[in-house]
């Protein structure tokens, strides 16, 4: 330090080395020249000079007292340069050259020049201030020099929002006094005359020292003295101004006011740093709390969706068949209700869950936080796998329902057909066993025997005709067994009874023939006409019975072609009716001829044809029945034809709409894929275009709703196929859901890109360059790059990731950042996040640790009281609940470890 006491030795006079100081940059010199508005050719205003002397003297003494000295007369005590050099050493904290020992003028000039050279070395241009004027006690030059020192060492470093020192100090005063009434700081002279601004500055930082509400604007002297006394007593700021001088001066000296106000700024700068540190911590904690809330929402939504999938899949995998078609149709209705009501909200939840997950990951990357890893079993991939399992079970369940309904329809048809044929057969066999067991031939005449033989032959013919029916009954019963008919036991019992009875009839028929043939040799007369009648009547009667069966037979058709085939067969049957009618007339003519011969020959007949039980009345009755059934069959076929025509109309209507909607969905999917790759214009333009595109898609929803209505009509009509279109309702539903999901995901990607761009300060040109590079290597236009494609993209952008050991290590590090889940793919969003991190600064754990250290007063730990004093209540309690106790050797009671807490926020340790 300068030995300002060593001034006793004799000086030798020599040439002056005074003059302006040198050095300093142009920028700093220009700044000082702007601040220095001294008119060096004129004398100072006496009032201003008085204020400056008092203020500058007090300011110098506030620093010189640290060295154990002071000045009394500012233009006299600096003349030898010793205290001037000492002042510069105190305020700069640097050593100046050793002063010259001697009291001669040359020694004083040299000492002052050393001080001026030191000032110039700090980038200050000393305009018209020379050592000779200071040594000669020039008051104006001395005050100007001190003002230059004050500007450089007390005011220059004050900067608020990149303003100059004077403007920064003024802006600081304006901000701190803004909430106070009657205070309007616009300058450094008249704005301070009433003293309220000084009191407001003190009250803003130390409210316990000033009772501001009791101050009056019309009592400036009291206000000024109150502020000066409080500042000197409690803030260690010496009294640099005189209240009466300020009040009685029309325009107080600006430099004196600035000097005094700068002392307040430096006194309160510590509080400003604490406020900045607290704001930084609050910002970091707010981001962390928001991310935790998003993580909790994701876990809850994912858990609910997976639970719904877990409950739904067993229901869809239930394949227990029902006994009746009504029960299966109820199952089908329940399934349609699931498709219409229960599933669509879950599809929307799944899409929203993916969007929330991507947004959360983007926010974590932007805030330099580790990627979010959901709980085990709740990853997006787990949800997609569960959803895929659900879709597979759903598809299999619908196919099973339709197959079961077809099976039950087939079973109902076969069961009814079995009952009809069995009833007809049982009616035919009724009494046949008793007839075959009858021993009437033992007492019959020869003619009777011959009649019995003929009758038996007719019966055998009838029996042979019924063989087909029995085989059909057995075949139907077998098919019912194979299709697992629920009442197959009764069917089998009835079928077995019919077969056993049929075998017994065959055996009885054979035995009776042998008995009749044994006595046939005794019989010679036979009525040929009755025989001919019987032989022709029996087949004709069987034909009529078969015709009645066919006319009453149930039919199930599903297409126009099938019903037209039935109509054609029916028309062909009707074309045979004239021949059948002629056959009937011929048979009746035989009976009439027999009656005529008997009457003409006075032959007494027994009344019935001995060879057959088919009388003309039966033939006529059955013929009338056939004639009645034909128009009924016509009506039934025409009704079914109308139904199938209606079904065909439904098919064509659905196909027309589906063939329009299906290609539209495919076209939109392709256009979205192209838009997501090309991405022309700004991101905002792209987002607006995509949202307009999304609205056009949503506006198309009525076409899909119309298709759903048409599909409902088709299902109600039990139409199972449609040859007019390859699109199914399920296919179109899936396509629509994928379209909505794709456009929502694309919009979300652009929004995340905007978020990334704004957060990281990426220009539109950079974003377009990144997109162009990404698209160039995205050969398959899949929206993601494989490792080799990503490496090529990085190399094209100038990253040193060549195929050597060092390049491989760097590339593996980059891959762990852009692909934390190790999926083997790098999305464009991850690529943008990486590029933005490489080109912009982000907050770090070290910054947060430094901020906590400011709040803790440079201690290695912080207390709960300090956190509650500096942070908002909720964030203070958040820190206290999560900070571990400090274990260091300098730990105090209640000490908390803010370092481990800060690193945990950035994933560098565990909370």
Swiss-Prot record:
Keyword hit for Transport: yes
SMART domains in the cross-refs: CH (SM00033), EFh (SM00054), efhand_Ca_insen (SM01184), SPEC (SM00150)
Region of interest (Disordered), ranges: 12-31
Residues spanned by motif LXXLL motif: 84-88
Pfam families with a match to the protein in the record: CH, EFhand_Ca_insen, Spectrin
Tissue specificity of this protein: Expressed in the foot process layer of podocytes in the kidney glomerulus but not in tubules (at protein level).
Stretches the record annotates as Actin-binding: 1-269
N6-acetyllysine found at: 114, 214, 592, 625, 779, 859
Residues with the Phosphothreonine modification: 249
Keywords annotated in UniProt: Acetylation, Actin-binding, Calcium, Cell junction, Cytoplasm, Cytoskeleton, Metal-binding, Nucleus, Phosphoprotein, Protein transport, Repeat, Transport
One of the GO BP terms on file: regulation of apoptotic process
Ranges for the Spectrin repeats: 293-403, 413-518, 528-639, 649-752
Region ranges (Mediates interaction with MICALL2): 736-911
Residue numbers spanned by region Interaction with VCL: 12-26, 40-61, 108-126
A single Gene Ontology CC term: cortical cytoskeleton
Chain intervals with Gly residues compositional bias: 16-29
Major site of localization recorded for this protein: nucleus
Residues annotated as domain Calponin-homology (CH): 50-154, 163-269
GO MF annotation: an example: calcium ion binding
Residue positions, PTM Phosphotyrosine: 31
Modified residues (Phosphoserine): 696, 909
Cited SUPFAM superfamilies: Calponin-homology domain, CH-domain, EF-hand, Spectrin repeat
Entry-linked InterPro entries: Actinin_actin-bd_CS, CH_dom, CH_dom_sf, EF-hand-dom_pair, EF-hand_Ca_insen, EF_Hand_1_Ca_BS, EF_hand_dom, Spectrin/alpha-actinin
Subunit composition and interactions: Homodimer; antiparallel. Interacts with MAGI1. Interacts with MICALL2 (preferentially in opened conformation); stimulated by RAB13 activation. Identified in a IGF2BP1-dependent mRNP granule complex containing untranslated mRNAs. Component of the CART complex, at least composed of ACTN4, HGS/HRS, MYO5B and TRIM3. Binds TRIM3 at the N-terminus. Interacts with PDLIM2. Identified in a complex with CASK, IQGAP1, MAGI2, NPHS1, SPTAN1 and SPTBN1. Interacts with PPARG and RARA. Binds to VCL; this interaction triggers VCL conformational changes. Interacts with SEPTIN14. Interacts with IGSF8.
Family: Belongs to the alpha-actinin family.
Protein name: Alpha-actinin-4
The organism of origin for this protein: Rattus norvegicus
Gene name, Swiss-Prot/TrEMBL: Actn4
């Amino acid at each position: 330090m300068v030995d300002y006491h060593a001034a006793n030795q004799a000086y030798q006079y020599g040439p002056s080395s005074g003059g302006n100081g040198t050095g300093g940059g142009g920028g700093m010199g220009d700044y000082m020249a702007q601040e220095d508005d001294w008119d060096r050719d004129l004398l100072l205003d006496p009032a201003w000079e008085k204020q400056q002397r008092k203020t500058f003297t007090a300011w110098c003494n506030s620093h010189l007292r640290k060295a154990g000295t002071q000045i009394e007369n500012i233009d006299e005590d600096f003349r030898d340069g010793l205290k001037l050099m000492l002042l510069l050493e105190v305020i700069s904290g640097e050593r100046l050259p050793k002063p010259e020992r001697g009291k001669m003028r040359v020694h004083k000039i040299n000492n002052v020049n050393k001080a001026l050279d030191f000032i110039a070395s700090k980038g200050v241009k000393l305009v018209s201030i020379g050592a000779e004027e200071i040594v000669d006690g020039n008051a104006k030059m001395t005050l100007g020099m001190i003002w230059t020192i004050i500007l450089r060492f007390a005011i220059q470093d004050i900067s608020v929002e990149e303003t100059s020192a004077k403007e920064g100090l003024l802006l600081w005063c304006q901000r701190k006094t803004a909430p106070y009434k009657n205070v309007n700081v616009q300058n450094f002279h008249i704005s301070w005359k009433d003293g309220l601004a000084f009191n407001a500055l003190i009250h803003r930082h130390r409210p316990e020292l000033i009772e501001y509400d009791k101050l009056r604007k019309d009592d400036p002297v009291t206000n000024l003295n109150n502020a000066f006394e409080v500042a000197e007593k409690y803030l260690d700021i010496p009294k640099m101004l005189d209240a009466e001088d300020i009040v009685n001066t029309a325009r107080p000296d600006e430099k004196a006011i600035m000097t005094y106000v700068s002392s307040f700024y430096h006194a309160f700068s510590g509080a400003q740093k604490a406020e900045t540190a607290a704001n930084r911590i609050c910002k970091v904690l707010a981001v962390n709390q928001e991310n935790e809330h998003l993580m909790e929402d994701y876990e809850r939504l994912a858990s609910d969706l997976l639970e719904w999938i877990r409950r739904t899949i067993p229901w869809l995998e239930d394949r227990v068949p029902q006994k009746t078609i009504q029960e299966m149709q109820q199952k089908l209705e329940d399934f349609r209700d699931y498709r219409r009501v229960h599933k669509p909200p879950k599809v929307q939840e799944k899409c929203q869950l993916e969007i929330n997950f991507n947004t959360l990951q983007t926010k974590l990357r932007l805030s330099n936080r580790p990627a979010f890893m959901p709980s085990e079993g709740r990853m997006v991939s787990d949800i997609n796998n569960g959803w895929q399992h659900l879709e597979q079970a759903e598809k299999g369940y619908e196919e099973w329902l339709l197959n079961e309904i077809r099976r039950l329809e087939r079973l109902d048809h076969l069961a009814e057909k079995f009952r009809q044929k069995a009833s007809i057969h049982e009616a035919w066999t009724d009494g046949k066993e008793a007839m075959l067991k009858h021993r009437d031939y033992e007492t019959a005449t020869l003619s009777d025997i011959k009649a019995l033989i003929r009758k038996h032959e007719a019966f055998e013919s009838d029996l042979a005709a019924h063989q087909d029916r029995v085989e059909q009954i057995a075949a139907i019963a077998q098919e019912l067994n194979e299709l697992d008919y629920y009442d197959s036991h009764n069917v089998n019992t009835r079928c077995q009874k019919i077969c056993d009875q049929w075998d017994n009839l065959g055996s009885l028929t054979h035995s009776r023939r042998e008995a009749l043939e044994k006595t046939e040799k005794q019989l010679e007369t036979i009525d040929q006409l009755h025989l001919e009648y019987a032989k022709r009547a029996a087949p004709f009667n069987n034909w009529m019975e078969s015709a009645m069966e066919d006319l009453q037979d149930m039919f199930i058709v599903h297409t126009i072609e099938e019903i037209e085939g039935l109509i054609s067969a029916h028309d062909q049957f009707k074309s045979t009716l004239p021949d059948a009618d002629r056959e009937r007339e011929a048979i009746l003519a035989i009976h009439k001829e027999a009656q005529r011969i008997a009457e003409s020959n006075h032959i007494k007949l027994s009344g019935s044809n001995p060879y057959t039980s088919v009388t003309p009345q039966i033939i006529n009755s059955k013929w009338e029945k056939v004639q009645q059934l034909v128009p009924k069959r016509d009506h039934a076929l025409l009704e079914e034809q109308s139904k199938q025509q209606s079904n065909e109309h439904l098919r064509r209507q659905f196909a027309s709409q589906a063939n329009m909607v299906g290609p539209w969905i495919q076209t939109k999917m392709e256009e979205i894929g192209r838009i997501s790759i090309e991405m022309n214009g700004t991101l905002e333009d792209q987002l607006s275009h995509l949202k307009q595109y999304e609205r056009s898609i949503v506006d198309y929803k009525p076409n899909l709703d119309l298709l759903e209505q048409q599909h409902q009509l088709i299902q109600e009509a039990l139409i199972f196929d449609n040859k007019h279109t390859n699109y199914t309702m399920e296919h179109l539903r899936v396509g629509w859901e994928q379209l909505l999901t794709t456009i929502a995901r694309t919009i979300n990607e652009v929004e995340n890109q905007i978020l990334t761009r704004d957060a990281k300060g990426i220009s539109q040109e950079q974003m377009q360059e990144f997109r162009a590079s990404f698209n160039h290597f995205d050969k398959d236009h899949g929206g993601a790059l494989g490792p080799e494609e990503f490496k090529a993209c990085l190399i094209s952008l100038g990253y040193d990731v060549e195929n050597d050991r060092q390049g491989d290590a760097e590339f593996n590090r980059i891959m762990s950042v852009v692909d934390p889940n190790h999926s083997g793919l790098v999305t464009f969003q991850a690529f943008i996040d990486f590029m933005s991190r490489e080109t912009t600064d982000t907050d770090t754990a070290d910054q947060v640790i430094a901020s906590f250290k400011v709040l803790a007063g440079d201690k290695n730990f912080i207390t709960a009281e300090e956190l509650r004093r500096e942070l908002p209540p909720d964030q203070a309690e958040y820190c206290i609940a999560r900070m571990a106790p400090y274990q260091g050797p300098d730990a105090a009671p209640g000490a908390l470890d803010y370092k481990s807490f800060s690193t945990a926020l950035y994933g560098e340790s565990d909370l």
